[in-house]
Amino acid sequence: MLNKMTLHPQQIMIGPRFNRALFDPLLVVLLALQLLVVAGLVRAQTCPSVCSCSNQFSKVICVRKNLREVPDGISTNTRLLNLHENQIQIIKVNSFKHLRHLEILQLSRNHIRTIEIGAFNGLANLNTLELFDNRLTTIPNGAFVYLSKLKELWLRNNPIESIPSYAFNRIPSLRRLDLGELKRLSYISEGAFEGLSNLRYLNLAMCNLREIPNLTPLIKLDELDLSGNHLSAIRPGSFQGLMHLQKLWMIQSQIQVIERNAFDNLQSLVEINLAHNNLTLLPHDLFTPLHHLERIHLHHNPWNCNCDILWLSWWIKDMAPSNTACCARCNTPPNLKGRYIGELDQNYFTCYAPVIVEPPADLNVTEGMAAELKCRASTSLTSVSWITPNGTVMTHGAYKVRIAVLSDGTLNFTNVTVQDTGMYTCMVSNSVGNTTASATLNVTAATTTPFSYFSTVTVETMEPSQDEARTTDNNVGPTPVVDWETTNVTTSLTPQSTRSTEKTFTIPVTDINSGIPGIDEVMKTTKIIIGCFVAITLMAAVMLVIFYKMRKQHHRQNHHAPTRTVEIINVDDEITGDTPMESHLPMPAIEHEHLNHYNSYKSPFNHTTTVNTINSIHSSVHEPLLIRMNSKDNVQETQI
């Protein structure tokens, strides 16, 4: 029994046999993976030695550490990285590639001159990028690629000299853009802000601007700061497209004049700050189109308090009746200096209604043409409106498809219709009252009758007598009186004398009323005729070329085959023993590999030899025939 129960050592291991050669590499791979995981966890939970970290390494502060480059060892969980006030000069490519959770990157107040393309790769969640107070001279547009969630960009106080077109089109998600204190800025392209359709805040303060740049692409802009510039005048159209703008700051911008209708595009404006400028007067009803305006700052301006400022006093009283001392004080005249504008009334002044120096004139036009009715007052501080024939009052900025009031008060028609016919009244207003002037617009329907290309002009001339001719040699000739009609046009020359000889000339001329369409029709007909002539000429040239080639080919065929009478002779019938072979033709060359070239027959030889030879040739060359020419010219051999 014991012998049966004794187990051999080889039988102790049950199952598959252990293979150490396979186990060792697998163990190495597992250990490597564990090390990588541990290293990743360690890196995710580490903090650079020169920085301070908080909130489970999500906030890394490296301020004023004299860093010359981005430090290593920043946690991948970092959401805010502050590198403020260091010595960094270059942001190299992939400097933040592993910080995929980073939302705020603060690089302000360094010495950054260059930002390489791809420097911000991997920052797909970046929300705010601060680059103010550095040494950038250009907008690093190429570095903004892939910042699809960037909302705020701060470039304040950099020596940037120009802003080219599409400078920010790589970051259409941008909401706030700070370009303030670009003191070396000398040029802003017309398309500089293209692509920023989602921008809500723009700072262009202290940028040495002498005029307002094109802001039309910023259709959602809410706040605009233009303070500290050199904007001597604000003109109509400066804020075109900014229908959603709510806050406008132009503090200390050296503004001297704000022209009529300058703010008409700002329909949503709530607050405007014009403090610390050089304003003395404002155009009548400047703020009237701003129905949502609630706060206005006009202090620290040298206001000249006269009749033209009364409307502003009344407007302030209506806007803030409980606080008329809120806004501005008079600087001149001396008797009103220091008095608040909101406290003035008409008793302080002797005022008059406005004067229209260029009233509109009656106008006759044809349907479809453009037209203008001008109306100019003695001063640009008045407001101008128009009353249409149906009683509608039109002001600058009022939406009409074909009719608009321009900034100078002109009523402009881009395409008149017959329905536009009627009387239009220009109304010029100031604080005292209104002055009106009217004009009639007469629109004639376009004629649809067929036009004649030519009409007859009858010219009647009267020759003066010799005495009168001598007295009028040194004088200017009589002024012709021209009367044009639709069908018959007559030009009359009226002399100074009644004694004359009348001569009548009939001259065909182009009808004035139908001249333009007649010329068009003639040009069309001329083009058609020229086109047909060119086509016929080309076809004739092609036919001549074809005819020439066919004739040349036919001539060659006739040259190689001259017309002659030939007689085909059967060799078996004509060749006899008595006939010498001198007059026989030589045999043609037989182009077969097994035959040699046949030479001319030699004479004389017997008939038997000749017959045998010919029979042998018949069997080889399929019975050739000899051609005998009737003439004594050279003979050709032909194989048939």
UniProtKB/Swiss-Prot annotation:
Chain positions with Phosphoserine modification: S631
Coiled coil, from the record: none
One Gene Ontology term of the molecular function aspect: cell adhesion molecule binding
Subunit structure: Interacts with NTNG1 and WHRN.
Start and stop residues of the LRR repeats: 77-98, 101-122, 125-146, 149-170, 173-195, 198-219, 220-241, 244-265, 268-289
Physiological role: May promote neurite outgrowth of developing thalamic neurons.
UniProt subcellular location: Postsynaptic cell membrane
Pfam families: I-set, LRR_1, LRR_8
Ig-like C2-type domain ranges (all copies): 354-442
Protein name: Leucine-rich repeat-containing protein 4C
Source organism per UniProt: Homo sapiens
Keyword Transmembrane helix set for record: yes
Spans annotated as Disordered: 463-483
Location of the LRRNT domain: 45-76
Intrachain disulfide bonds: C375-C426
Domain LRRCT as annotated: residue spans: 301-353
